[in-house]
Amino acid sequence: MESRPPETECEFDAVVIGAGFGGLYMLHRLRSLGLSVRVYEAGGGVGGTWYWNRYPGARCDVESMQYSYSFSEELEQEWEWSEKYSPQPEILKYANHVAEKFNLHDNIYLSTRVERAVFDENKNRWFIHTDR
């Protein structure tokens, strides 16, 4: 994924911190509601814990189907888990597949840490500060 320029004053309806499985779903859901969304992810890719934890033998301890999103019947039909308890690379591959299928990367800033979030009561607005 290409490097993005730093942002200064940008407005979004919602900001999601993290592009793990919860962050990807939240981005998909908020966009489906017609909201403008930005996701900030500290890692260089999506997948959350499955991006960060790449040690030998890493795999899920719940059935792989528990990681499957149910918001798209087409997605459910086209993805088949190879094992009941999938290894880390397969789970990460699934997260990337979902991000690509639903064009989620367009709204995700990778390698970007949120340093602080400040709520301005007078403006009724959050201000998000990142390391970029």
Q: Where do the protein language model's features map onto the residues?
A:
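A short, basic/flexible loop-to-alpha-helix module at the beginning of a structural domain
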Residues: 1-12
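N-terminal Rossmann-like FAD-binding beta1-loop-alpha1 element of flavoenzymes
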Residues: 10-39
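Catalytic P-loop NTPase motifs of RecA-like helicase/translocase cores
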Residues: 24, 46-47
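Residues within well-ordered alpha helices
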Residues: 29-31, 49, 98, 102
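Short, glycine/charged-enriched secondary-structure capping and boundary segments
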Residues: 30, 52-55, 124
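Glycine-rich active-site loop/strand segments that organize a redox cofactor
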Residues: 44, 51-97
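Short catalytic/ligand-binding loop motif for oxyanion handling, primarily in non-cytosolic enzymes
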Residues: 47-48, 118
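Feature captures the FAD/FMN-dependent oxidoreductase FAD-binding
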Residues: 81-132
